[in-house]
């Protein structure tokens, strides 16, 4: 149906609106501050060009990431309890997973807290967990991915590979935003299923978008 095929387009424009509102809302006071000789911290660094979720969070809401790193990640990962956990993991799990188990757990906790920071309800907690699970998994599987790239002779310096990684990251971010839009957790899967079943990408170019409330100027 038309309403069903609108789901991903509305979601796409929500992502664009979110970035423009958030980045623009920060860039305006930064620009005004520079008129008075005050250099405020950069908060966004072209996140649309990120090639991984980790890279995305280095570029998106940079001041929040820096605060979480200094006041959550380091205190947790360098605590005595996590030191013991790290030694236990090295002994009982072994391998790469054992070496980075404690660090990965601390990373997961950070993104869980980022979810709560955005809003103390299931939508934002699920959003934080989505990012935490994927980033933690990427840490644990990093060496496996490197072996696959070597076996497939992937040139990770090529423009094609960078485009692929950028689009893949954008897709993961796009899916994650469904959690913050759905009224209930079950609705997330309903929206995703609708997106897959009724994509109709041609509507991005055939003028249908104007019917969503956009006006030509």
Please give the residue ranges for each predicted region:
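Membrane-embedded transmembrane alpha-helical bundles that form the catalytic cores
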Residues: 2-216
């Amino acid at each position: 149906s038309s309403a069903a095929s609108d789901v991903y387009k509305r979601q796409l424009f929500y992502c664009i609106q979110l970035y423009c509102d958030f980045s623009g809302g920060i860039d305006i006071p930064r620009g005004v501050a520079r008129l008075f000789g005050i250099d405020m911290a950069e908060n966004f660094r072209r996140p649309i060009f990120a090639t991984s979720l980790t890279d995305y969070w280095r570029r998106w809401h940079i001041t929040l990431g820096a605060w979480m790193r200094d006041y959550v990640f380091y205190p947790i990962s360098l605590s005595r309890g996590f030191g013991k956990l790290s030694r236990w993991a090295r002994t009982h799990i072994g391998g790469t997973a054992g070496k980075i188990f404690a660090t990965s757990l601390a990373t997961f906790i950070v993104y869980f807290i980022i979810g709560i920071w955005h809003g103390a309800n299931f939508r934002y907690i699920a959003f934080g967990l989505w990012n935490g699970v994927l980033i933690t998994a990427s840490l644990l599987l990093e060496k496996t991915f490197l072996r696959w790239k070597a076996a497939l002779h992937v040139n990770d310096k090529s423009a094609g590979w960078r485009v692929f990684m950028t689009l893949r990251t954008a897709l993961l971010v796009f899916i994650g935003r469904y959690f913050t839009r759905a009224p209930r957790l079950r609705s997330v899967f309903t929206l995703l299923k609708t997106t897959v079943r009724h994509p109709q990408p041609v509507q991005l170019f055939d003028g249908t978008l104007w019917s969503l409330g956009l006006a030509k100027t």
